[in-house]
Amino acid sequence: MMLEHVLVLSAYLFSIGIYGLITSRNMVRALMCLELILNAVNINFVTFSDFFDNRQLKGDIFSIFVIAIAAAEAAIGPAIVSSIYRNRKSTRINQSNLLNK
């Protein structure tokens, strides 16, 4: 694939993730959009590493770190959402002000 095609795909995924993160009212949807953003960043890291830096694997190593962060977010995020749901009976972002009781 050409560099431009991969970058357009990554920009498309990133834009969908940002739009979903800004407009979502549900915490689960916001977590999924955050995963889309992280995957778009991974695509960029691997693409630039492949096209411009064939011998060194800096982009690949960065993408492994981002995958590790995404895995931690995927493990901790739903646990936090389920805890909030048990206490508030809602996963809507605007109804989960935890500072007011």
From Swiss-Prot:
Coiled-coil annotated spans = none
Gene Ontology cellular-component terms for this entry are: chloroplast thylakoid membrane; NADH dehydrogenase complex
- EC numbers listed for it are 7.1.1.-
Compartment(s): Plastid, Chloroplast thylakoid membrane
Q: Name one Pfam family in it.
A: Oxidored_q2
The principal localisation class reads plastid
The residues that cross the membrane are 2-22, 32-52, 61-81
InterPro entries per UniProt: NADH_UbQ_OxRdtase_chain4L/K, NUOK/Mnh_C1-like
State the UniProt keywords alphabetically. Chloroplast, Membrane, NAD, NADP, Plastid, Plastoquinone, Quinone, Thylakoid, Translocase, Transmembrane, Transmembrane helix, Transport
BP GO annotations: ATP synthesis coupled electron transport; photosynthesis, light reaction
Q: Does the keyword Transmembrane helix apply?
A: yes
Q: What class of enzyme is it?
A: translocase
GO molecular function per UniProt = oxidoreductase activity, acting on NAD(P)H, quinone or similar compound as acceptor; quinone binding
Topology of this chain in the membrane: Multi-pass membrane protein
Q: Which reaction does it catalyse?
A: a plastoquinone + NADH + (n+1) H(+)(in) = a plastoquinol + NAD(+) + n H(+)(out); a plastoquinone + NADPH + (n+1) H(+)(in) = a plastoquinol + NADP(+) + n H(+)(out)
Question: What NCBIfam families has UniProt attached to this entry?
Answer: PRK05715.1-2, PRK05715.1-4, PRK05715.1-5
Summary of the function given for this chain in its UniProt record = NDH shuttles electrons from NAD(P)H:plastoquinone, via FMN and iron-sulfur (Fe-S) centers, to quinones in the photosynthetic chain and possibly in a chloroplast respiratory chain. The immediate electron acceptor for the enzyme in this species is believed to be plastoquinone. Couples the redox reaction to proton translocation, and thus conserves the redox energy in a proton gradient.
What family does this belong to?
Belongs to the complex I subunit 4L family.
Classification via PANTHER family: NADH-UBIQUINONE OXIDOREDUCTASE CHAIN 4L, NADH-UBIQUINONE OXIDOREDUCTASE SUBUNIT ND4L
Tell me, how does this one assemble? NDH is composed of at least 16 different subunits, 5 of which are encoded in the nucleus.
Protein's name according to its UniProt entry: NAD(P)H-quinone oxidoreductase subunit 4L, chloroplastic
UniProt source species? Vitis vinifera
